[in-house]
Amino acid sequence: IQADXPTFQVIQDDN
């Protein structure tokens, strides 16, 4: 998982 992009933020937002 890359925390340098919006992808990580989306995963955290899902929680």
Curated annotation (Swiss-Prot):
Q: Where are the transmembrane segments?
A: none
Localization: Plastid, Chloroplast thylakoid membrane
GO CC terms of this entry: chloroplast thylakoid membrane; photosystem I
Keyword list (alphabetical) reads:
Chloroplast, Membrane, Photosynthesis, Photosystem I, Plastid, Thylakoid
Q: Taxonomically, which superkingdom? A: Eukaryota
What is the protein's major site of localization? plastid
Could you give a single Gene Ontology term from the biological process aspect?
photosynthesis
What functional role does this protein have? Essential for the activity of NADP photoreduction.
State the name under which the record lists this protein. Answer: Photosystem 1 reaction center subunit 8
